[in-house]
Swiss-Prot record:
Gene3D superfamilies: Ribonuclease H-like superfamily/Ribonuclease H. GO terms for cellular component: cytoplasm. GO terms for biological process: DNA replication, removal of RNA primer. It is found in: Cytoplasm. Pfam families: RNase_H. InterPro entries: RNase_H, RNaseH-like_sf, RNaseH_domain, RNaseH_sf, RNaseHI. Monomer. The keyword Metal-binding applies. The keyword Magnesium applies. This is Ribonuclease H. It catalyses: Endonucleolytic cleavage to 5'-phosphomonoester.
Length: 183
């Protein structure tokens, strides 16, 4: 699915883990147009759950998948092994075991994992892991978006997002700017 119509990069951050505040960051590229959107959210609390890095990572994927048209192929790229493994490998066993881990404990973050599973059921999603802080320009931008959201400050803007997408050849260079929206 390397030619998925949508590529979604996501990252999450908790300044104090657990406890927060936390933030999410994402960039979604629509290869068919080309167009993209990006953004992030600051989380001071997360309902009855503590703000954690893993919850922010999962929430970032949810935000990235929000609004994508059903039936489309999406590649989600994350530097979180937890996200990639939870959503592509472990989820199948957890469902069979009544949302229990191999050791019999309740699955942490079940609410978000089930929400992502429901959203992904309308799409064809592939989860891909990349090493964080290893020269992946778009991954660095989503990390900066998540960190900025957690701190409650402005993060990278459109110029930085476009530069990162071009650096990794997701967008061609040239004078015509692709359509964008900041979430």
């Amino acid at each position: 699915m390397s030619q998925a119509r949508f590529i979604a990069f996501s990252d999450g951050s908790a300044l104090v883990n657990p406890g927060g505040p936390g933030g999410t960051g994402f960039v979604v590229l629509d290869r068919a147009r080309p167009a993209y959107r990006f953004g992030g959210t600051r989380w001071v609390e997360d309902g009855p759950n503590a703000v954690t890095n893993n919850r922010m990572e999962l929430r970032a994927v949810l935000e990235a998948l929000e609004g994508l048209p059903g039936g489309e192929q999406v590649e989600v790229i994350s530097d979180s092994r937890y996200v990639v493994d939870a959503l592509s490998r472990w989820i199948h066993g957890w469902r069979k075991k009544g949302w229990r881990t191999a050791s019999g404990e309740p699955v942490l973050n079940r609410d978000l994992i089930e929400a992502l599973d429901a959203r992904a059921s309308a799409l064809t999603v592939r989860y891909t892991w990349v090493r964080g802080h290893d020269g992946h320009a778009v991954n660095e931008v989503v990390d900066q978006l998540a960190q900025a959201a957690a701190r409650g400050v402005a993060g990278p803007g459109e110029a930085e997002v476009v530069a990162a997408l071009r650096a990794e050849a997701f967008l061609a260079g040239g004078s015509a700017a692709p359509r964008s929206s900041r979430a």
